[in-house]
Curated annotation (Swiss-Prot):
Belongs to the paired homeobox family. Bicoid subfamily. A motif (OAR) lies at residues 276-289. Residues 1-93 are annotated as: Disordered. GO terms for molecular function: DNA-binding transcription factor activity, RNA polymerase II-specific; RNA polymerase II cis-regulatory region sequence-specific DNA binding. This is Pituitary homeobox 2. GO terms for cellular component: cytoplasm; nucleus. A motif (Nuclear localization signal) lies at residues 282-286. Keywords: Cytoplasm, Developmental protein, DNA-binding, Homeobox, Nucleus. SUPFAM superfamilies: Homeodomain-like. Transmembrane segments: none annotated. One of its GO terms (biological process) is camera-type eye development. Residues 12-21, 78-87 have a biased composition (Basic residues). Pfam families: Homeodomain, OAR. The lineage of its organism: Eukaryota, Metazoa, Chordata, Craniata, Vertebrata.
């Protein structure tokens, strides 16, 4: 009986074990299928998410904004690079740059590099400094020219339009006849030629008006320039005859004034001038004879140093 029970028990036990094994098998299969389903679900979700993102432009813009924010948060040095940094020059650097600018306002590359080495600056800084300095120089030049045009040239051009009202307040137009030549204004002036000859330029009528007497005519005859002595003898003789007919006693009695000049120069110095101006001298002699002036004394009889007598060759 026991032997019969044993196989049954064994079979029963085996069956039970098989049943338990069959129960565990679906559990293991389900557990193995769960990760596969999760992976499939995740892939499906990713595909749907990408399709929805590409289809909507708003999501694309959001992604771009997020990427920019991430880049800006990752690299904050870009903002610092965009800012312009001011260079603070020392007095020695400015002195060297100004001295070079006075010599050359447009330095080339090699000169800028040399200046950069001297001043311990970069070539770009030196180039920018020269550019700004030239702009400042041009602005100053324009301002100076504008000031000159306003202050300097303006009054000059206005003065050309009305010169006498501004520059000469005491002057009036068309006042020559009313004023005339006053003795007070001329007596204060010095005339060395008249003072040397003891002649008053206002009292002697021979300088400003025709002579009124024979004595004044004789004085004027002595003051005739020396070039008149080169007039031919015929005209001189006619003038002498006219003077003798008028009053021969006065002609001989009036003394000749003292000559302030030195002795005459050699005779042939004035030869060319006398020959060239012979026609003009003849005309002057005729004018003297027509106005009634006294004639010049005969050069052959009475010559003085004042008359600059010229010995004509025979």
């Amino acid at each position: 009986m026991t032997s019969m029970k044993d196989p049954l028990s064994l079979d029963h036990h085996h069956h039970n074990h098989h049943v338990t094994g069959s129960k565990h098998a679906p559990l293991s299969m389900a557990s193995s299928l769960q990760p596969l389903q999760r992976s499939v679900d995740s892939k499906h979700r990713l595909d749907v998410h990408t399709v929805s993102d590409t289809s909507s432009p708003e999501s694309v813009e959001k992604e771009k904004g997020q990427s920019k924010n991430e880049d800006s948060n990752d690299d904050p040095s870009k903002k610092k690079r965009q800012r312009r940094q001011r260079t603070h020059f020392t007095s020695q650097q400015l002195q060297e740059l100004e001295a070079t600018f006075q010599r050359n306002r447009y330095p080339d590359m090699s000169t800028r590099e040399e200046i950069a080495v001297w001043t311990n600056l970069t070539e770009a800084r030196v180039r920018v400094w020269f550019k700004n300095r030239r702009a400042k120089w041009r602005k100053r030049e324009r301002n100076q020219q504008a000031e000159l045009c306003k202050n300097g040239f303006g009054p000059q051009f206005n003065g050309l339009m009305q010169p006498y009202d501004d520059m000469y307040p005491s002057y009036t137009y068309n006042n020559w006849a009313a004023k005339g030549l006053t003795s007070a204004s001329l007596s204060t002036k010095s005339f060395p030629f008249f003072n040397s000859m003891n002649v008053n330029p206002l009292s002697s009528q021979t300088m400003f008006s025709p002579p009124n007497s024979i004595s004044s005519m004789s004085m004027s005859s002595s003051m005739v320039p020396s070039a008149v002595t080169g007039v031919p003898g015929s005209s001189l003789n006619s003038l002498n005859n006219l003077n003798n007919l008028s009053n021969p006693s006065l002609n001989s009695g009036v003394p000749t004034p003292a000559c302030p000049y030195a002795p005459p120069t050699p005779p042939y110095v004035y030869r060319d001038t006398c020959n060239s101006s012979l026609a003009s001298l003849r005309l002057k002699a005729k004018q003297h004879s027509s106005f009634g002036y006294a004639s010049v004394q005969n050069p052959a009889s009475n010559l003085s140093a004042c008359q600059y007598a010229v010995d004509r060759p025979v």
